[in-house]
């Protein structure tokens, strides 16, 4: 199953500052780029950055995104 926007994911890339940390998927690019998943973290790194791009195989889904409530009419 593909990773969706809003999912909580754990980073499995060992050289990453956020290795084994949990972040939220901000966006998923479907154009075919090498690192299509943008993940946002609560913790900032040494350069005051809190987002990074990852491949899907470098991430482990911890919690699926909550379904949006349908608007009542």
Swiss-Prot record:
SUPFAM superfamilies: Electron transport accessory proteins (SSF50090). InterPro entries: Elect_transpt_acc-like_dom_sf (IPR008990), PSI_PsaE (IPR003375). One of its GO terms (cellular component) is photosystem I reaction center. Keywords: Membrane, Photosynthesis, Photosystem I, Thylakoid. It is a peripheral membrane protein. One of its GO terms (biological process) is photosynthesis. It is found in: Cellular thylakoid membrane. Disulfide bonds: none annotated. Pfam families: PSI_PsaE. Stabilizes the interaction between PsaC and the PSI core, assists the docking of the ferredoxin to PSI and interacts with ferredoxin-NADP oxidoreductase. Belongs to the PsaE family. PANTHER family: PHOTOSYSTEM I REACTION CENTER SUBUNIT IV A, CHLOROPLASTIC-RELATED, PHOTOSYSTEM I SUBUNIT IV. HAMAP family: PSI_PsaE. This is Photosystem I reaction center subunit IV. The lineage of its organism: Bacteria, Bacillati, Cyanobacteriota, Cyanophyceae, Synechococcales.
């Amino acid at each position: 199953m593909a990773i969706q926007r809003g999912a909580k994911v754990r980073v499995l890339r060992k050289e990453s500052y956020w290795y084994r940390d949990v972040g939220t998927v901000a966006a998923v690019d479907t154009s075919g780029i090498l690192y299509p998943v943008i993940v946002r973290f609560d913790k900032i790194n040494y350069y005051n950055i809190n987002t990074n791009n990852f491949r899907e195989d470098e991430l482990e889904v911890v919690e699926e995104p909550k379904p949006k409530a349908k608007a009542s009419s």
